[in-house]
């Protein structure tokens, strides 16, 4: 009888020990780190990172909502390659590329991107006879059945849809004709320029809808920065962050002041980080209007997209262009296509000799 009780007691103690040991070996809960939300400037004509090469144009790596997006590719493939390597960016892990428009200072680096990631998806604006490829229904031209076959297009039997070539054969390009949500919370705005010199040019801008509001990345803003922001407000009535080229480099001071005040007072943009073709006078005006909500976005800068991205920027010191920035910016501007839109008046405005 005592042996039976002793056996039962031993079994009970063993069970308690086993249960307690199981409890102590349960894995402790772990918290999943939030996905990165940041923008790194890979191509521009001003900046303080001595490891990178300045050139006129724009490219930025956008890492947000779990996606890695290359927005534009700059003016020179070799320069983009050097800058990408300097920042340790792996272009083989892109989710997709966005080409804002067809100008060379935004698309010339694509050849390098394709050399390391030949099958990456590329979004580009759809334009008739555009460099990214296009098509038209053959009914767009008038026919004359009285002509002999040798005088008729396609011997009088054209295809229903005429497809046109691209400068990037074999690339995985998807053409965007209208504002389109390409993946949940990420939308490409498609607008057309009405400005002299770029009339009918179609441009894409990138919007990411976040809990803090819209993050808006623009390439050159040929359709007008105010028009692009107004379109973004249809996605979310709050613009949290705006960066890229505002195309005020050719504008006179009254226009610059009007746009700066509109972005601040009318559209109520939280934070602003202008670059590329925004222009030196516009940098100054926007700093004055936005104060500590203006972020320096020179070449090599990484901007963290948080509720207060100013605190997370890795750029210290002055917000504006220093003397070296200004000299390089003006020199590269003088060589760019942006000068050709309004001629000598731009040279005077930019202070280029």
Q: What kind of region is each of these model predictions?
A:
Residues 78-123, 127, 233-243, 247:
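Active-site metal-binding motif and surrounding structural segment of the metallo-beta-lactamase
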Residues 62, 72, 84, 101, ...:
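Divalent metal-coordination and catalytic microenvironments
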Residues 128-203, 290, 295-308:
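Metallo-beta-lactamase
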Residues 169, 262-334, 339-341, 346:
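Binuclear metal-ion centers of metallo-dependent hydrolases, dominated by the metallo-beta-lactamase
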Residues 19-21:
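C-terminal motif of bacterial Sec signal peptides marking the signal peptidase cleavage site
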Residues 1-8:
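Bacterial N-terminal signal peptides that target proteins for export
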Residues 106, 121, 205, 211-302:
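Cap/insert and terminal regions of metallo-dependent hydrolase folds
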Residues 38-87, 199-217:
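Conserved beta-strand hairpin/beta-sheet module of binuclear metal-dependent hydrolase folds
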